[in-house]
């Protein structure tokens, strides 16, 4: 059955309350340093790719068993499950495209029955993080490409896509979708995007689903 619409979401501080790399940083004893770089990247003060390299380098030596510990500390944003279940019932597809890590995002996607997911992957040797990423880096341009690909796979126009995110890395994706929503976002993001949600309840996105239906 053809999809009725597509929702593409960021993960850290959007679908979930936390920034996973900050939680990993705490485990590495680098919490304050990594959180500082994350904040600068999300507000657009520094380049995302460079910030990712800097932060991942600080995780070098962590055992891969740390992912299970971090996953237990993650909280879905209020309304996340209800939003996704409602959209699936309406015939929509849901995709996650994250500057975070497959090692965590895949588990979230599985639990929520997400249709599509793409994130960064951390390089591992002998059961420990090397301090580098492996494969394609999910940056702002990649997020746009993935949104377009998923829309195309479902024979949807971009006008039938909603995107939700909170960081500077999300701005091009938000402006590519028919409706792009800055979710509890940094000022620079809100200034660049037409639609905003300022309360941490993802069920509010359903109001924009109705708005999209009204456009048709």
Curated annotation (Swiss-Prot):
GO terms for biological process: L-serine biosynthetic process. Gene3D superfamilies: HAD superfamily/HAD-like. Its cofactor is Mg(2+). GO terms for cellular component: cytoplasm. It is an enzyme of class 3 (hydrolase). The keyword Amino-acid biosynthesis applies. Pfam families: HAD. Pathway: Amino-acid biosynthesis; L-serine biosynthesis; L-serine from 3-phospho-D-glycerate: step 3/3. The keyword Hydrolase applies. The active site is at residues 10, 12. InterPro entries: HAD-like_SerB, HAD-like_sf, HAD_sf, PSP. CDD domains: HAD_PSP. GO terms for molecular function: L-phosphoserine phosphatase activity; magnesium ion binding. Mg(2+) binds at residues 10, 12, 166. Substrate binds at residues 19, 55, 98-99, 143, 169. SUPFAM superfamilies: HAD-like. Belongs to the HAD-like hydrolase superfamily. SerB family. This is Phosphoserine phosphatase. The gene is serB.
